[in-house]
């Protein structure tokens, strides 16, 4: 099934823009920039939206205006309005359980403690959507997670995350064509 909607999870606002938790939005923003596409605020959809077309595969790019933990409502509103099935959605998000700079494509699964994914699963009524997980590493103890994800990465970690984003963007044409197995083989290797 071809992907028709890519959502970059984030917390909106300049205070959060450069934090680890916004790695998903970094990728979606970079993808739009590489295709000379510009986001526009759509208050009805509760998001910044734009559209790209790669090899005759159109896709909407979304940056929710809500905080990460409420990303599901935006995802549901947009997917219902455009009649996009959960299996046609790619959620791009930060992942504590991957080392900094790793990136993995996954279909379905649980939320793994990620509140953005938890809300999307609840709002869509299913976890059967695709995820592009950008590794941000783990602070080592669960009590440090909140502060860690809302902090800025070091320059070294930031560069590793950017490198992962480049690898993620490289598979988007394959993802949009619907060949998830090939995309997984390429990016998960």
From Swiss-Prot:
Pfam families, sorted: Pept_tRNA_hydro (PF01195)
Annotated site (Stabilizes the basic form of H active site to accept a proton): 94
Reaction(s) catalysed by this chain's protein: an N-acyl-L-alpha-aminoacyl-tRNA + H2O = an N-acyl-L-amino acid + a tRNA + H(+)
One annotated Gene Ontology cellular component of this protein: cytoplasm
Top-level class of the enzyme under EC nomenclature: hydrolase
PROSITE patterns reported for this sequence: PEPT_TRNA_HYDROL_2
RNA-binding as UniProt keyword: yes
Quaternary context: Monomer.
Xref: NCBIfam families: pth (TIGR00447)
Official protein name in the record: Peptidyl-tRNA hydrolase
Source organism of this protein record: Legionella pneumophila (strain Corby)
Gene: pth
